[in-house]
């Protein structure tokens, strides 16, 4: 889901250096740590798409588990002062009532979620065993500008704008908590600076909505017919509901989400409308191959 175009504008900043590399490559990562001697590591690097993890879990294990292990070893060796692991609410699994707290048991359902849960456990182990100063954030479903078009919201926006079918898994009643990307970034920044070492922090948007509601809302904003909705066979192991308790991050750091779903989704739609070139580039190559292969199995050949 990475895209170099997302980094435009950073090239001229003196403290910015881009290196294209695989975090699971210990030799390459060792060279980077040796050269730059980072004081802190914030690990956003991950394979993140659940559908891809079901089709091909190996890259998820390689990046999300082995890669994190490489970063932890090097952080320990080079005396990194703070290691922040970016994780996901999916490590908790599904919850029908109530909300997950940071001390809730991990019960991942998909290979993606399992790889992130494994990484979280590894990160915590380096704190307990070696005293590495770590933090973990677990965010709910992100959305907003620059999101790769394989994810639900940009997929719906893109297909609807082009009058193509919009796939909805199962009955569409799966609930997700939608977090605008700028809210997430603000929370991560605050956790990095003010979070307590060794702690986990949930980050949510307090916008719990069914997938079907989200799809219908986007279609309404785009003045498109709901006839574009096509219900497809449910995803294996599809979690029914995610919900995060934000009590800890409110009490300890004073953060709360600020962007409502209506405001955030309108901003997102407008961004995709204005950035057709970015979309075209993002949809080329591997994305297009995956898209055709995966959705053709669901009977959506026109996509």
How should each PLM-predicted stretch be described?
Residues 97, 108-115, 145, 149-153, ...:
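The catalytic Tyr-centered alpha-helix of NAD(P)H-dependent dehydrogenases
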Residues 21, 154, 160-303:
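C-terminal substrate-binding subdomain of Rossmann-fold SDR/epimerase-dehydratase oxidoreductases
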Residues 84, 96, 131, 147, ...:
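Proline-centered turn/helix-capping motifs that create local helix->coil transitions or kinks
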Residues 5, 31, 52-55, 147, ...:
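Generic recognition of short, well-ordered alpha-helical segments
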Residues 1-142, 211, 267-277, 281-303:
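N-terminal Rossmann-like NAD(P)+-binding domain of SDR-like oxidoreductases, especially those catalyzing
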Residues 34, 73-77, 124-128, 158, ...:
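Short, well-ordered alpha-helices that flank and scaffold nucleotide-derived cofactor binding pockets
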Residues 38, 145, 205:
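Short, conserved catalytic or interaction motifs in soluble domains
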Residues 3, 25, 152-153, 184:
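Amphipathic coiled-coil/heptad-repeat helices and related helical stalk/stem segments
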């Amino acid at each position: 889901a990475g895209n170099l175009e997302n980094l435009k504008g950073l090239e001229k900043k003196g403290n910015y250096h881009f290196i294209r590399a695989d975090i699971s490559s210990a030799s390459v990562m060792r060279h980077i740590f040796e050269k730059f001697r980072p004081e802190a590591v914030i690990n956003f690097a991950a394979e993140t798409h659940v559908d891809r993890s079901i089709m091909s879990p190996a890259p998820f294990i390689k990046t999300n588990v082995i890669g994190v292990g490489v970063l932890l070893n090097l952080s320990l060796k080079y005396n990194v002062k703070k290691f922040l692991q970016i994780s996901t609410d999916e490590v908790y699994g599904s919850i029908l009532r109530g909300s997950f707290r940071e001390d809730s048991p991990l019960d991942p359902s998909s290979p993606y979620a399992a790889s992130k849960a494994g990484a979280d456990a590894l990160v915590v182990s380096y704190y307990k065993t070696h005293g590495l100063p770590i933090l973990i954030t677990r965010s709910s479903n992100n959305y907003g500008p620059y999101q790769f078009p394989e994810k639900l919201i940009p997929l719906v926006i893109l297909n609807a704008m082009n009058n193509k079918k919009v796939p909805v898994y199962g009955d569409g009643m799966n609930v997700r908590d939608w977090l605008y990307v700028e809210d997430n970034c603000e929370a991560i920044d605050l956790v990095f600076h003010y979070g307590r070492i060794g702690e986990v922090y949930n980050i949510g948007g307090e916008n719990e909505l069914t997938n079907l509601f989200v799809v219908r809302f986007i279609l309404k904003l785009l003045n498109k017919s709901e006839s574009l909705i096509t219900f497809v066979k449910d995803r294996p192991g599809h979690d029914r509901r995610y919900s995060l308790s934000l009590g800890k991050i409110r009490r300890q750091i004073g953060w709360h989400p600020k962007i409502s779903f209506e405001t955030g989704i309108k901003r997102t739609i407008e961004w995709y409308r204005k950035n057709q070139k970015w979309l075209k580039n993002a949809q080329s190559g591997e994305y297009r191959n995956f898209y055709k292969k995966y959705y053709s199995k669901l009977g959506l050949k026109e996509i």
